[in-house]
Amino acid sequence: MEISRASDRPFTHGEQDRFTGEVSLGSTIADPQGTNVGIVHFVAGARTRWHRHPGGQFLIGISGRGRVRSRGESGHLLLPGDVIRVGPDEWHFHGGAPDAPMAHYAVNGGGAPDWAEPVTDEEYSEGF
């Protein structure tokens, strides 16, 4: 058994080549098969770039109000307790709502994500 205590987790600032706006990341736990769990905090309007995970991703809302959208699809609201599954290699973004911050757990399957271009303001607003 492995335990990750909240008091032992340092948070780091999200890198500009992966995020737009102020984002804080907290790593929690990873297993030998490559699955990892992290906590991500977004200020209002902050978001990831377009990206995909080879092993897929689950997003579990903790607080606030967020946005999640896959390329070419309508967007979805992420609220505390909501769970969104993003399929393997599905291009998507997630972040805080324009007027509210958001925090979520991210459960990522094996393999490093592929990061692409920033989400434009138009893409961030479209489909919600």
Name each model-derived stretch.
Residues 32, 46, 68, 99-105, ...:
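Ligand-binding pocket scaffold of soluble enzyme catalytic domains
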